[in-house]
Design a protein with these regions (language model features):
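Structured, charged N-terminal subsegments at the starts of enzyme catalytic cores
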Residues: 224-274
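Short active-site neighborhood of thiol/selenol oxidoreductases, capturing the structured segment around
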Residues: 361-394
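Bacterial Sec-dependent N-terminal signal peptides
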Residues: 1-33
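A non-transmembrane, solvent-exposed segment enriched in polar/low-complexity residues
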Residues: 25-100, 105, 114, 118-229
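Thiol/disulfide oxidoreductase modules built on the thioredoxin-like
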Residues: 445-483
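Structural microenvironment flanking redox-active thiols in thiol-disulfide oxidoreductases
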Residues: 388-429, 445-449
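Helix-turn-helix repeat elements of alpha-solenoid scaffolds
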Residues: 188-191, 254-262, 297-298
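N-proximal helix/coil linker or "cap" segments that precede and/or mark the start of modular domains
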Residues: 297-353, 362-372, 399, 418, ...
Length: 490
């Protein structure tokens, strides 16, 4: 097993627990940390802040859910109505020896064993002390740990509490020893196999074992296998870190599939998830594909957003995302849904320098025999550094172009006519008989081209067939050249 495969199990193990439905645990969940060993070696000092933070779909909370100032050898941290999920305990070293500042409003209280109130320290280095999992097993409402420090890492030994967290502490210790080089590959594998066997023997570790199987079994790496062990039907994974990265890895492993196949797979992923997870998975898919490296895959983001993020009459998704993020998704869809690959390019009318209107793209029906087989839309302006770099590269490419006829619509997006005329002169290099150039503009934006063609920035390039079908978008001179070569080879 690769070194980083072991380390990845750290995140896997954080999903310990039963497979019951997610709910807030009744009463308080207490975490008792005996820090004697860590204090004696100076890793933890009086005045340092100990804080519990939780995850929501891979994002660590910024404010502590519970906190305390180190004053004695033991610290008790309390989570009120804790959600079932993954938590981390962070240590923030006091800055400049200060005793700390007042607590943040709304935080749950925590105390040192002498009963003094906790406070958050200002500044200082933050270190991850340990991880634990809150299950909804009512028999385990308190976890006890001994915290030590060696090899520049904190170690947590579980003294009392849920069996899952005992295995988690054991796993973390093995991973940290392996990372520090104190144990080798063979010892690490033996330790992890032992922990996995213990997890299999536990009645309440189905979620953990399904994820452990994914990381431990090197013989099964098929896409179908990866998909089968993603526990998306379990609502508790909303409050974890590992599953989000697993979903992303799964989707990235499929990125060479067609856009249609990816859209189907993405929809299946969302549909298979628990209702509380659906918007989070949909948002993750949207963010992954909205700036897709492979041309055309932004269509996946558009489709998922329309079906699962914007089609919400209750307003709960807008509340979850916040107005700005929700509006950003809406704007992305509106600026891209009309000009995706495979679609017929929207028809617009733009004037040339003489005021003659040109209806573009030319769609072939009723056109004369000289109509171009390819049509290139190039949106650019004068006060754009990227345009100043792209225009000469594009002109040089079209000058040496050899292939089926192509027409370029050089569409100036500014409103200054003299600047437009200066920009037109930059295309004078093109004297290729296979290339026809038409200079157009729309200073009043009467054609609504920014919305119809997704021109939120310049330069933008889009290629269509003689029928006006979009075959390339978001092109650069290099990707345009590659696309033209592929088209001409066929």
């Amino acid at each position: 097993m690769e070194r980083w495969s072991y380390i990845s199990l750290l995140f896997v193990a954080l999903l310990f627990g039963s497979t019951q439905q997610l709910r807030s645990a009744e009463g308080a969940f207490r975490l008792r940390l005996n820090c004697k060993a860590a204090i004696e070696c100076g890793a933890i000092s009086k005045g340092d802040t100990i804080a519990i933070k939780g995850f929501t779909w891979g994002e660590l909370s910024t404010a502590p859910l519970s906190y305390g100032i180190v004053k004695g050898r033991s610290i008790i941290l309390t989570l009120q109505n804790a959600k079932c999920g993954e938590y981390v305990v962070e240590l923030r070293k006091r800055a400049g020896g200060s005793k700390g500042a007042s607590a943040e409003d709304g935080s749950n209280g925590a105390s040192a064993e002498d009963g003094s109130n906790g406070a958050s320290a200002a500044g200082g280095r933050v270190r991850n002390v340990m991880e634990f999992f809150v299950s909804d097993a009512e028999s385990h409402r308190e976890e006890k740990y001994a915290i030590s420090y060696k090899n520049d890492a904190f170690y947590a030994q579980a003294l009392e509490g849920a069996a899952e967290n005992g295995l988690l502490a054991e796993l973390n210790a093995s991973i940290r020893d392996f990372s520090a080089g104190t144990i080798g590959n063979k010892q690490a594998k033996e330790a992890l196999d032992s922990i996995y066997s213990k997890a299999l023997a536990s009645d309440s570790s189905a979620l953990f074992t399904s994820l452990c199987r994914l990381s431990l079994d090197n013989r099964c790496r098929s896409v179908r296998y990866i998909r089968s062990v993603l526990p998306l039907e379990d609502p508790r994974v909303l409050y974890t870190n590992f599953v989000k990265s697993s979903v992303e890895s799964y989707l990235k492993s499929l990125e060479r599939n067609s856009t249609e196949a990816l859209t189907f797979i993405a929809e299946d992923l969302v549909q298979s998830a628990h209702s509380t997870l659906k918007p989070y998975i949909a948002l993750q898919i949207f963010n992954l594909f909205k700036e897709a490296e492979i041309m055309g895959q932004e269509a996946v983001a558009v489709e998922i957003a329309k079906r699962y993020l914007l089609n919400d009459e209750s307003g709960s998704i807008e509340e979850m995302l916040g107005y700005e993020a929700y509006f950003g998704i809406m704007a992305f869809v509106q600026m891209n849904e009309h000009s995706l690959i495979g679609m017929k390019a929207p028809q617009i009318e733009l004037p040339d320098s003489l005021g003659c209107l040109h209806s573009i793209p030319e769609c072939g029906e009723g056109a004369d025999d000289a109509s171009p087989s390819l049509q290139l839309f190039y949106f650019y302006t004068s006060n754009c550094s990227s345009c100043r770099a792209t225009t000469p590269l594009l002109a040089e490419l079209l000058q040496r172009y050899e292939g089926i006829p192509i027409r370029i619509y050089a569409i100036f997006t500014g409103s200054n006519r003299s600047e437009w005329m200066s920009e037109c002169a930059k295309f004078s290099l093109i004297k290729n008989p296979l290339v026809e150039r038409i200079d157009l503009w729309d200073p009043e934006v009467e054609s609504n081209f920014p919305l119809l063609y997704g021109v939120i920035s310049t330069p933008q390039m889009l290629l269509t067939t003689d029928k006006g079908i979009i075959v390339g978008r978001r092109l650069t001179p290099k990707s345009l050249e590659q696309l033209l070569e592929a088209i001409n080879e066929n």
